[in-house]
Structures are given as structure tokens and as C-alpha cells.
Amino acid sequence: MAVFHDEVEIEDFQYDEDSETYFCPCPCGDNFSITKEELENGEGVAMCPGCSLIIKVIYDKDQFACGETVPVPSVNKE
């Protein structure tokens, strides 16, 4: 059984259109991430590649089943 660091609503994530990935800051300084495809497949766990923390993503599964994207601010990564 997974132990979640936190539960975060998808609206609190930043969305990168190029990679179709949602990002949320992790306490370690890296970012939790989950792809649009993972959400469409019903997966609701975002992982941080910089540490072992995972978070539960709160989102409307019906919204992603239709291939829709939740409008959130884009992140310009430079």
C-alpha cells in the first residue's frame, strides 16, 4: 500500500503543453509529475524523480476520459 505525501488537486498543477505533463513542486526542490495520458488511463499518482515521495492527484476522471485538458497556467521552461 502506497503512503502519499499529500493529496493535490489537478487545478494546482502547472501544465506543459509540449510534453502534455502536469507538474507540481516537491519539497525536495524537484517536481512531481504526471502525464495527460496517465490521467486518461485512470492513474492518479504523481511521482517525484528527485526523491521517493508520491502524491495522490485529485481530478475528475470523466473530464480526462473525453480527452479534455484542465485549463491551468503553462510553465515556460528555459
UniProtKB/Swiss-Prot annotation:
Boundaries of every DPH-type MB domain copy: 4-60
This protein's record includes keyword Mitochondrion = no
Q: Give any GO molecular function from the UniProt entry.
A: metal ion binding
Answer yes or no on keyword NAD.
no
InterPro entries documented for this protein: DPH3/4-like, DPH_MB_dom, DPH_MB_sf
BP-aspect Gene Ontology terms: protein histidyl modification to diphthamide
What does the record say about domains? The DPH-type metal-binding (MB) domain can bind either zinc or iron ions.
- PANTHER family in alphabetical order: DPH3 HOMOLOG B-RELATED, DPH3 HOMOLOG-RELATED
**What is the protein named?**
Putative DPH3 homolog B
Q: Which organism is it from?
A: Homo sapiens (Human)
